[in-house]
């Protein structure tokens, strides 16, 4: 019987103390929140359970009890049975840290009464007072209790942040901030990055009262961090729509203070989220809209990166921002738009800049235009590239390497295809005597295939080009690549098939990929049968054909509607007496927008 009892004790000890290897918690950990927790804890210990047994992350039952805000009697029992009140888990957190984090006023007070050290530090250097500073809503009471038991109100964590700094970084903690200051917190202590509590409050708080509280208790409104930012710089980057900027300026913040890279608060606001309100406020208080930083970048340059670029640009331009200002690399705001990652469509931003005189052909120090820059952007936006072209960007402009935007786009077949649709030159070389086709073969065969389709089409549209030395060189390059030979043959098949479909003695279906004369095409478009527009009919030039035919049909519809409307509303006998062909010729001199206005305004 004695042997059995001893064996039973050994087995139970193994069970109680090792069950956590299979499960996260031991029975002792689970017991702390049961109604009869004290009795169960005593029973487990009497059966051989280790009072200091740990679960995952090296937490004891006391850690669990503190985190789950167990009754003071449970905490007292665990400690009286042998748990160290300042025991730490794998994160070096004590039970007191957990009690404070969980907003546990009663548990916190009990642990302190039982000897918990209010200045013990978590692995990141934070004391329970740091934790209390971030607790809502009982932060002020927790702070008072901890300081009453000896907590250092200016304790520093591993980043040199005080409890006041952590409170300032959160919203809705002004009462906690007031309590900390009342108990001796220093408002001027900087962390390792030179950041003061006022910097943090200016950037994070939606309540300007927090900012005012810190200033009224001695915070330096123009204090600079290691990057040279003042609290006003930080407020300008904040997403919050608050009165913080006005509050800082009211208390003496320098609106044109420059940080270590030369950015003013207006620079920061320009590139921030939700910038419009902040820009207007700063400008109203004297911010220089044409201030330049260390590389001559203005707020207008940076506004192109905002999530509301168009509105930000509009505010700056309305207040005198120079739309063609250049940085030290010769880049204008239009260049910056070409590299913007804004989630907003940038077409309206381009329209706004052009409307106010921005040079869409401006060149940077290496001769690159906004178009060439956009074509060399790994996160390219086809709509933006097309917008540049539609607003007059020269598709064949050359940089100092004698390269056109096509060279910049070689790695991106979608961009190459777009440039081909606008007839970018292919029979050219750069200063290294390399053609776009040769560059594409070396970098992206998909782009090479697209370029071949344009080379063959150009030869069809402009027969004289066949005598050009670079064209001959391109054709030789094609013949040396089996894959490109197949593309060439497919191109020629499409062209010959279109040529075989005749409308009359002069024109066939091929005119729609050969000519850009929209009036000529609109006069012939009624001959085009829908079967020719089906996706499988022309594998190479089908898209180009469809685009041309649809544009011609739209043009014809506008012409017909305009003639009909003018015939119905005019009392001029001369107009009605004109032959229909002459009416077409007269209206054909108008653009699509003019015809659309006739239809819209006279209907």
UniProtKB/Swiss-Prot annotation:
InterPro entries: Ankyrin_rpt, Ankyrin_rpt-contain_sf, Multifunctional_regulatory, PRANC_domain. It comes from the Viruses. Keywords: ANK repeat, Repeat. It holds the Pfam family PRANC. The keyword NAD does not apply. ANK repeats lie at residues 23-53, 57-87, 91-120, 124-155, 159-189, 193-223, 227-257, 261-291, 295-325, 329-362, 366-397, 401-428, 432-467, 504-533. This is Putative ankyrin repeat protein FPV162.
């Amino acid at each position: 019987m004695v042997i059995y009892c001893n064996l039973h004790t050994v087995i139970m000890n193994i069970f109680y103390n090792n069950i956590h290897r299979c499960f996260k918690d031991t029975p002792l950990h689970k017991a702390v929140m049961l109604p009869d927790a004290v009795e169960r804890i005593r029973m487990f210990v009497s059966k051989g359970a280790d009072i200091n047994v740990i679960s995952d992350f090296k937490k004891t039952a006391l850690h669990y009890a503190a985190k789950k805000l167990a009754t003071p009697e449970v905490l007292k029992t665990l400690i009286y049975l042998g748990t160290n009140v300042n025991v730490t888990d794998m994160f070096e957190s004590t039970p007191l840290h957990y009690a404070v984090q969980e907003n546990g006023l009663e548990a916190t007070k009990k642990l302190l009464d039982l000897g918990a050290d209010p200045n013990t530090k978590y692995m990141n250097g934070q004391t329970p007072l740091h934790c209390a500073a971030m607790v809502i809503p009982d932060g002020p009471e927790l702070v008072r209790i901890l300081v009453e038991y000896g907590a250092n109100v200016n304790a520093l964590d591993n980043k040199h942040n005080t409890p006041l700094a952590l409170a300032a970084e959160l919203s809705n903690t002004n009462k906690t901030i007031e309590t900390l200051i009342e108990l001796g917190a220093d408002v001027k202590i900087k962390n390792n990055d030179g950041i003061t509590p006022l910097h943090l409050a200016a950037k994070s708080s939606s309540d300007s009262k927090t900012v005012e509280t810190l200033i009224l208790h001695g915070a330096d409104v123009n204090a600079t961090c290691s990057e040279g930012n003042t609290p006003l710089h930080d407020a300008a980057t904040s997403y919050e729509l608050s009165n913080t900027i006005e509050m800082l300026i009211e208390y003496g913040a320098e609106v044109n203070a420059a940080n270590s890279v030369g950015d003013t608060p207006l620079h920061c606001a320009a590139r921030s989220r939700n910038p419009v309100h902040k820009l207007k406020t700063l400008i109203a208080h004297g911010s220089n809209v044409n201030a330049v930083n260390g590389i001559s970048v203005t707020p207008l340059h940076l506004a192109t990166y905002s999530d509301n670029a168009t509105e930000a640009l509009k505010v700056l331009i309305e207040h005198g921002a120079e739309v063609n200002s250049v940085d030290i690399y010769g880049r204008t705001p239009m260049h910056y738009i070409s590299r913007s990652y804004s989630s907003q469509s940038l077409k309206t931003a381009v329209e706004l800049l052009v409307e106010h005189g921005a040079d869409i052909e401006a060149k940077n120090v290496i001769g690159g235009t906004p178009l060439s820059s956009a074509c060399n952007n790994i996160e390219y936006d086809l709509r933006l590239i097309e917008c540049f072209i539609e607003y007059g960007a020269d598709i064949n402009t050359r940089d100092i390497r004698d390269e056109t935007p096509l060279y910049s786009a070689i790695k991106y077949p979608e961009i190459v295809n777009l440039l081909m649709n606008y007839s970018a030159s292919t029979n050219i070389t750069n200063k290294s005597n390399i053609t776009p086709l040769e560059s594409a073969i070396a970098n992206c065969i998909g782009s090479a295939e697209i370029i071949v389709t344009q080379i063959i089409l150009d030869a069809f549209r402009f027969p004289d080009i066949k005598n050009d030395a670079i064209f001959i060189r391109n054709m030789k390059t094609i013949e040396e690549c089996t894959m490109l030979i197949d593309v060439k043959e497919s191109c020629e098949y499409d062209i010959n098939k279109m040529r075989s479909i005749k409308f009359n003695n002069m024109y066939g279906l091929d005119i729609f990929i050969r000519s850009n004369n929209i009036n000529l095409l609109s006069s012939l478009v009624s001959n085009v049968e829908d079967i020719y527009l089906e996706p499988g009919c022309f594998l190479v030039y089908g898209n180009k054909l469809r685009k041309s035919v649809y544009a011609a049909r739209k043009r014809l519809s506008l012409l017909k509607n305009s003639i009909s409307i003018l015939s119905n509303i005019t009392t001029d006998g001369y107009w009605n007496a004109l032959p229909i062909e002459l009416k077409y010729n007269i209206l054909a001199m108008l653009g699509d927008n003019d015809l659309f206005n006739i239809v819209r305004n006279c209907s």
